[in-house]
Amino acid sequence: MMVVFFDSRTALFCHMVEIMLCAIIAPSPLEFIFLEFIAGLAAINSLKDLSRRSQLLRTAVLVFLTYSVGYFAIDILLTGSPDKLVPRMFGSFGINAVFVSFAYIMIFVVEKIFGFTSKVTLVELSDVNNPILRELSEQCPGTFQHSMQVSNLAAEAAHRIGANVQLVRAGALYHDIGKIENPAFFTENQHGVNPHLALSPEQSARVVIAHVPDGLKRAEKGKLPMVIKDFISQHHGKGKARYFYTSYCNTHPDEEVDPAPFTYPGPNPQTKETSILMMADAV
């Protein structure tokens, strides 16, 4: 479970602590530590990139084989003969493997109770048939294509620096969903008519900046996890709607301009992943 929500190193540390505590009451502590360590190592390695349910079945089989081979090897080393193998031990190994198969249910329960977001959920959110993404593609085709391109670019950058690739990919797909409210006010969705020509720079900035809070409202309605909402709120940080700010300054050269109406609410990116998105979005 730990490897699904955190990383392999954290999962291995927790597994080792658990083994040492349980070994205190184990009849054969050294054999117990060895078997549990290799089985846990196999499970962690198999589940570190969990993205499909079928991986749980593969992991269950791998855990059973690891237990069985380890037990057989220990028995041969200690007795020199397989005659003293205890058949019911293989039944215990099978039960442990079956418990691995139930991990998907536990992942769902833990996500709901503690608000964690697993890699499995991120993969599911990245499906372009998700209702929110489907609506984005229908209402804002230009924004949807932009989000796909930013997602690919950001995911590649995340891979290069060791950040959470799946989180960046999913976050990038949803970062501009607030544009669904006013698609024609964004250049990638315009087809010859620019509605900003009928607005003042302050009004235009207000409409453009609103796609951030609008996106958060839509994310809340769609029950998107907090880690995805962070990409929506932070992808512009506390930057300015630069074009409209500059336009206002040019038309009011003798006025001390208040930047607040042209400034995004933020906050600035708080993680590597949201920082990557901000840079990829600006390319």
Located regions from the model:
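Generic detector of multi-pass transmembrane helix bundles and their immediately adjacent loops
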Residues: 1-148
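Divalent metal-dependent catalytic cores for phosphoryl transfer on phosphate-bearing substrates
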Residues: 133-283
